[in-house]
Amino acid sequence: MIHIVDLPFAKTPQRLADVTFHEKPLRAKQTRFVGRSVLQPVLDLDNFNLKAVIDWIEIVVQLGKVTQFQHVQRKIEDELGQKCFIKAIGAGAGNASQTFSIRLQEPKSVAFVLEVERLLDVSFGMTAATTVNAIEFSVDAYPKIPSDRAREQLLGVMQRTIFSREDLYTNPNARPRLAWDNSSPKYIQPHRMHAYNERHYTAPKLDATMYLGAEADDVMLRLMDKIIDTQNKAEGTAVTLEPEKQRVRIEVTLQGSGLKRIGVATLADMKAMSFTRLQGEFFTFRLFTTPPRNQMLSQTKSGARYEDKINREIFLKAGVAGLLFKEHVRKSWRVNAKPLALLNLKNRGRRLKVLRDGVTAADQLIAYKGLNERVTRALRDLENRERRALKSLGV
């Protein structure tokens, strides 16, 4: 069975791309997947080169003397040639302090950040270990032959298969959403009363940035088609990247508990960090599985057939993010509404003989092995580059 999925644009609604999903038998040993089919994207991942980078890192340093931020900034920029954004913490008279947060954009390596730390230690002295306040990792996918269509299809697939372990629904600001230009974000999921109607879900737009998680969350994901750089939103200007530099990008910003999950608290912790761990924790992609159509037609319970049909349609339109919203609504109903229904039955002298959670939408998801493996490979390459840089520094 073939499913052709439309991939819409936000800024030019008349424009449309598409990608195909092939529904085919799944070969899996896990009991819950036996006899099921998988919706597999028709996309040759070998047509892309993936590269992982540290997009930026924010560290906090405690110096041995009181100074102003511009002196720290000048020292780093003049001697190491690294642009940085510095903020004094707990500043006193003359905006002077001993504690500063320093954000380094696109640092060459962790080893280079350690060089920054050494420079500040020599120049100002250090009274405590340098801590990591936040960090952003990116994985970029470049078509081997520059192509708008190749990027559009890969992004459309990523938007539908990205899987987040975070709670995206308790905090309304964390909900999966799309943003473009200066417009208000458009949420992927509908009002909860329409959770079982795929027509009320919003399909991700190819020329929008897709967010999972709030700006202030400890973990936030972003997906985009990166075709511009050095954007100035206030002036409405940007530089269009050359075709060979245009790529699909997925970013994860970590702070607080997000850093703790990868074992990072201090800058020194990053020397032994496992970069490949990021794939399993954050850069995770999953595919939807469904019973074969002949099995669906033979199911005696119409509810089960309806559930499978709706899940398939939501996945194809709004992806895993849409499915997990529907599951959130379903669980909310079980927690809040079902006890009242059971109490009502009890008061009427009746009872529900069997109470089961059943198979959830999350249970029907399986790892997108091909994409996950390529992301892991890109992260391993990053880890190897970092190890070489540390070795050259003598660390």
Each language-model region and where it sits:
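Membrane-inserting effector segments that mediate pore formation, membrane fusion
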Residues: 330-343, 348
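Structured, helix-rich domain cores that form ligand/interaction pockets
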Residues: 1-329, 347, 356-395
